[in-house]
Every structure is written in C-alpha cells, then in structure tokens.
C-alpha cells in the first residue's frame, strides 16, 4: 500500500538537462515518466510542478539586464515547455495526464483551478501544473507549495540530485552530514537551502510536509511511496 494517497511532486528544470548543459535530455525525461507511471499504478493521485531553469531563469535574466517581470514571465513559459515535454513522455507510455496552466493559454493547456485538478486526479489522471503561480517574483518552489496546499496533498516530494538535506552542500563540503528528518523551524534557523523562505513558510503554516530525495536514481520515487527512508522529511 502506498505511503501517501495524494502527492505534489516538485522536479527541477535543471535535472531535465541530464548531463547536457541546456535543454531536455530525452533519457532523463523517459526515466522520470517511467517512475511516475510506477507510482500512478499504485493508485496514488499525482500533481507535478517542474521548474524551468534548464531553459531560462527569471532572476538570472534580470541580472543580465532583462526587466525582472519580463524575465519571470519567460521563466513561466519555460516551465510550460517542460510540462508539455513530460506530458508527451507520459502519454507515450500510456499515462493519462493533463497540463494545467496558471496563465490562460488554451489549447496548450487548461487554465488551472483547484477543483479541476482534484477532479482529474480522482479520475486517475496525472496533473502537471505549469507557469508557476502566474505572477512574477514567485519561484517554482513557492508555486509548488501553493499547488500542494490547494490540492490538499499529503506531502510535497521534492525530487533533487542529492539524497536529502545536509548540514552543508555535500557537493562542496565532504564533512556535511545528512538529516533523516528536520523541523521547518530548524531549516529556517540554519538557513538551509531546501527551498526559498516563502515556500518553506507556506508549508509550515499549512502543515504540508516536505520529503527531499534523489529523483535521479531510477526507482527512488516508488521506494519513497513504499515507505523506504531514502531522503529527508521536513515536518513540524
């Protein structure tokens, strides 16, 4: 039996690059789609948010001279591109899914509402939420927190390239140690880079647990759903 009934899966755009420096790696995309299919077949209701950093990042764009609002809007469009790619990959292996956008852009995707999303998930469709919150100055992590809270998810699963939360960046500090679980309060007091401050505070205020794990290891998503402790749980 699955550990959670309804999840919000957050994937980073950068992870879709695989070993490339830009864009979408077809093999990585297929790996993700197969993992999502495994969990969907367990009867889990799945909502997904994907970042757009493999294509464009609004904040870095503003640092290069772009207007911040325009830059963030470009970033929102990047998340739509990634969402369409994942939708196509899921459809290719028989997973029914729906792309919902925070900004109206039919026929690319349907305009998001909580009720539309829940109805689709209860009918067995995977919902992919794109275009962030539809507003500038909000990260896709914050968008993930918002969507997770709105759809009444049991947990936000944050798929990353590391196997949890550490005292420091394990890719830079070999002495960093991993937390099996940690409170929202400690994440904030330690200044750990799990998600941005707004996203963490939203989860804390609405009691949405966060589970950070390595999505790049094939099979890990199913392991999380089966109850294996392979990441870090953030909770009250």
Regions found by a protein language model. Give the residues of each.
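C-terminal catalytic "cap/lid" subdomain
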Residues: 1-236
